[in-house]
């Protein structure tokens, strides 16, 4: 149950009944401090201002008609007109019981929508690097959350699998194949192959001529060029899949929807935009001038959709892509997890899409932009030599560091167990360090911080789960077979239950805002509150058996909530560390 939404609805009804216009926001939020209750309604002052009345007097009118029977034990007016709401212990205990008995921990499924999520999007014939990490793991965490809420999510890995660079790559692939008879499906160093192709293109005019011819042939559907192109895509995606699997990212080959998918749509898009009077010829090119965007002279900005040589641009592809996602995939909502530097480009493409009538206004197009990963020097994260860090190398280093950490903490574990724990901790640390930061901000990549067992880190959260789970090992009981009822005898118990029951609010916020850090913050706060509860409220040596069973239930709900929350982030838990 989303308690915040329930109270918000009740307060909204009361505000309207007290004389405010329908739809006046109640602005119910979680209280910052326990002295202000569990929730606080902040919309009273805005409503009073609209009505031209005293806020505290209006707050009293709202309280007179507010029905929170069976939910709140107390309500009070605070400050200039806030309403503080204190949840009743009976309500909290009953909701905690219901959550523990539910495989979904009380999280309701939403009315299902079809949601397309565009994330990861590496380029063909290039290895994934750290710049792909944020889109890949942020997108995947949001996708998992949306699916948990019952939505149909279509993963779209919009890989860069088309363009003039494929001429030189195919020409080089052909050269290698002629020399060795067959190209290894490994092509272990894609970057080296790409650099070699570029060098040949720049230095060998005959090679460059062949490459240019292959671009034309590929665009014309030449069977040989298509076969070579497909081989390059296959080699790249096999390597990318290894990174996805290591990171526990849910993308597969079936989710690839590359730029090439939309090639056949592009001529028709241009023709249609011309017919609708949106695209006009300008210096031989087809251009859409947008009043919504101005150039430095204050004139409508021109967006080229077809070059004078007949070639199409990324914008043309993005228009076709958005159209396809609505018309063919039936999207109600489309999420783009793309670098913040692409914002204007996307906004221009979407403006054209709306003007052309390809997607109605009730379909949401959302750019979930993200900042950069920085080194300790505050600059983009690079190798010591100043090069781009390959994602596979980053994951290898994470594994080595985690292995050394586990070795130092638990040398008595078997080699197999150490390796398993190190791998789980390493991938979790890399992901959580990113996911725990606000998506739109840059963040500093710091090995020491991300592998620390203190603070808002993956090792801390994984250990928090292990610690809670160990209670049941010590008790010799299964957390799924507990008896008795949850009861509240201490403030720390009430605080823990109140936080546990905010899980659905965190889940829905991540789904709505595309911000996984909300879940990280929630889980970190929950772990801290459980720690306070654990120290203040003895579980296994509780003074009464009924209290022991109640506290075991609270520990079980905490363990399940942490495990489920981390699973939505694509992070595994461990039974022991």
From Swiss-Prot:
InterPro entries: aa-tRNA-synth_I_CS, Arg-tRNA-ligase, Arg-tRNA-synth_N, Arg-tRNA-synth_N_sf, ArgRS_core, DALR_anticod-bd, Rossmann-like_a/b/a_fold, tRNAsynth_Ia_anticodon-bd. It is an enzyme of class 6 (ligase). This is Arginine--tRNA ligase. Belongs to the class-I aminoacyl-tRNA synthetase family. The gene is argS. One of its GO terms (cellular component) is cytoplasm. GO terms for molecular function: arginine-tRNA ligase activity; ATP binding. CDD domains: Anticodon_Ia_Arg, ArgRS_core. Its main location: cytoplasm. The keyword Nucleotide-binding applies. Keywords: Aminoacyl-tRNA synthetase, ATP-binding, Cytoplasm, Ligase, Nucleotide-binding, Protein biosynthesis. The keyword Ribosomal protein does not apply. Its EC number is 6.1.1.19. It comes from Vibrio cholerae serotype O1 (strain ATCC 39315 / El Tor Inaba N16961). Monomer. It catalyses: tRNA(Arg) + L-arginine + ATP = L-arginyl-tRNA(Arg) + AMP + diphosphate. A motif ('HIGH' region) lies at residues 122-132. One of its GO terms (biological process) is arginyl-tRNA aminoacylation. It holds the Pfam family Arg_tRNA_synt_N. It is found in: Cytoplasm.
